[in-house]
Design a protein with these regions (language model features):
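Alpha-helical transmembrane bundles and membrane-interface segments of multipass inner-membrane proteins
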Residues: 2-137
């Protein structure tokens, strides 16, 4: 996550106008002072960082108590992604986003790899119990 953000920031002038990779996918440079989808934009960076660290601490306790590898990997992905964005907040008071998907003029808010880890981890935590129940039925 941090390596990709470093690359984007190092080439910010190129990414500022967007680089089309596919007709529906661009690489862009956005500094997001909120959380996912820009929610809570304008909230102090340190407040968002403190909240993220508190959530990571709670998830860390759950991680160490977990006896399920899939759950542990999902929790680790969430914690890792959240900490990647906390690093940005401490360094730049905002998070670097650079992945932009769009279709027919509709744009999904830009995001980064840390966000991908968080979303995938949450997805696994939500879907694994359903899959496991079906598997054991």
């Amino acid at each position: 996550d941090q390596v990709t953000k470093f690359f984007v920031m190092d080439n910010a002038s190129s990414f500022a106008t967007g680089i089309q990779i596919l007709p529906i996918f661009d690489l862009v440079y956005v500094q997001n002072d909120g959380v996912s989808f820009g929610m809570f934009g304008g909230m102090p960076w340190w407040g968002l960082s403190a909240l993220a660290l508190l959530i990571c601490a709670v998830l860390g306790v759950l991680l160490f108590r977990s006896d399920n590898r899939i759950e542990a990997v999902a929790l680790g992905a969430i914690i890792g992604g959240a900490l990647g964005n906390v690093v940005d907040r401490f360094r730049f008071q905002a998070v670097t986003d650079f992945l932009s998907f769009h279709i027919a003029g509709l744009y999904w808010p830009a995001f980064n790899l840390a966000d991908v880890f968080v979303v995938c981890g949450v997805g696994v935590l939500l879907l694994y119990p359903v899959w496991d129940a079906r598997r054991q039925a």
